């Protein structure tokens, strides 16, 4: 009430990154007794530095007037040239709010920035829009992806054509983009984007072999060739794109084919468990980060936790559960992103849940062993708590395999890692540096070794 009326007050919205809406402005304006100056935290990426946001500018209400907001400022990325596409949209919005159209403005911005490489830049930009967590943005809206079980020849061919376009984008941008400063900023992402195009295209070609079902050897060889190495993943994680549809298609396609292929060989359900939960991203490939046998990676909810939320594992079949090990938090035992009041439960049908342990309080490391319980699903469920942080899990192991539980004799130079050769899960492997000796159980009629390559 006593603040000089000429002083403008910045406001970032309901949360740090949020839309500009009449409701937001009404809330703050009624308290500061003047139209606020809106500080929009977009396209800033200081919370996701491995992304470079190139999508349309939307989330800015077109009914607002100077009576509601006295100004709008955009917080850009540290990449000045790459921020210009979003800044073009923000300027367009503030110039003529009532008639602003996000897609039309975006199309004009692409043309202004790269007049001789617009098509290539557009292909990259439309697939480099989402943040993967937090302030989510639409991405790849013109592209239809699918699971292998939903295969349709026409849809598959259309997606393959898109991946082939993506594969060519880096070279086309190098040739046609006259803004060398923009090209320099985008180049690391363009490089990884092109690789995504290649592995996506090859996943579709691999699926055609898989669906024919008559050439296991050819499928396996091409499957191994199209896997991402540790180095590939590190490079992609550093400069991500296509996170909403394209990379998930690749991951899901490879996983679905691996599951079906191994099930065919085993005659039983493989043990390639899936992450599940109550959060919006619980069904995405992000949950694989708590199942990758690497405690330096983690699954995170990406939104604040609330009572009743849970994180768990689908064992794909009803199994005897005798051991569970969970590491909560992102990277340490003093992290804030965890359930500080929780209970460990299991279920055969996903509806009726049975507690396995008493209520847990402020426990990052959770271990349970007991008599066999028939279950397909295991979960850690949040109970009443004041905590509103994200929830993160570094590791969620159910029935972790131990050498002594294999049922046959085994000798190797690395007893801790060798179990991954026998865990019925194609996402894991064991690298033989010297020799591997194992007993073939009595009554075994066939034995199949799935290998990457042999060095003689």
Segments (PLM) and residue ranges:
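Catalytic domains of carbohydrate-active enzymes that cleave complex glycans
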Residues: 102-274
């Amino acid at each position: 009430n006593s603040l000089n009326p000429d002083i403008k007050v910045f406001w970032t919205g309901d949360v740090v990154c949020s839309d500009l809406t009449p409701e937001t402005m009404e809330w703050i304006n009624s308290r500061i007794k003047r139209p606020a100056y809106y500080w929009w935290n977009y396209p800033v990426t200081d919370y996701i530095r491995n992304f470079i946001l190139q999508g349309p500018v939307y989330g800015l209400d077109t009914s607002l007037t100077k009576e509601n907001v006295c100004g709008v400022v955009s917080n850009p990325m540290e990449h000045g040239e790459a921020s210009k596409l979003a800044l073009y949209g923000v300027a367009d919005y503030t110039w003529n709010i009532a008639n602003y159209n996000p897609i039309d403005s975006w199309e004009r911005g692409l043309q202004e920035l790269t007049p001789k490489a617009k098509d290539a830049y557009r292909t990259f930009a439309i697939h480099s829009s989402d943040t993967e967590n937090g302030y989510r943005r639409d991405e790849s809206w013109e592209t239809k992806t699918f699971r292998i079980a939903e295969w349709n020849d026409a849809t598959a061919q259309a997606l393959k054509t898109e991946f082939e376009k993506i594969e060519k984008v880096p070279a086309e941008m190098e040739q046609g983009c006259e803004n060398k400063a923009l090209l320099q900023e985008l180049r690391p992402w363009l490089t990884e984007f092109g690789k995504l195009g290649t592995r996506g295209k090859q996943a579709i070609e691999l699926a055609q072999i898989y669906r024919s079902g008559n050439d296991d050897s050819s499928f396996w060889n091409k499957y191994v060739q199209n896997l991402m190495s540790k180095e590939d993943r590190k490079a992609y994680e550093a400069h991500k794109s296509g996170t909403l549809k394209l990379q998930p298609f690749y991951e899901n396609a490879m996983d679905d084919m691996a599951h079906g292929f191994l099930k065919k060989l085993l005659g039983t359900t493989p043990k390639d468990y899936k992450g599940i939960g109550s959060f919006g991203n619980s069904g995405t490939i992000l949950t694989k980060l708590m199942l990758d046998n690497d405690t330096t990676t983690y699954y995170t909810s990406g939104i604040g936790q609330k009572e009743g939320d849970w994180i768990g594992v689908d064992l794909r079949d009803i199994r005897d559960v005798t051991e569970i090990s969970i590491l909560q938090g992102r990277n340490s035992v003093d992290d804030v992103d965890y359930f500080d009041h929780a209970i460990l439960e299991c279920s055969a049908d996903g509806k009726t849940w049975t507690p396995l342990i008493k209520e847990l309080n402020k426990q990052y490391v959770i271990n349970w062993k007991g008599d066999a319980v028939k279950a397909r699903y295991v979960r850690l469920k949040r109970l009443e708590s004041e905590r509103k942080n994200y929830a993160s899990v570094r590791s969620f192991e159910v029935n972790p395999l131990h050498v002594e539980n294999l049922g046959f004799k085994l000798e190797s130079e690395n007893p801790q890692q060798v179990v991954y050769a026998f865990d019925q899960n194609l996402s894991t492997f064991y690298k033989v540096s010297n020799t591997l000796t194992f007993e073939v159980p009595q009554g075994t009629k066939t034995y199949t070794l799935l290998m990457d390559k042999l060095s003689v």
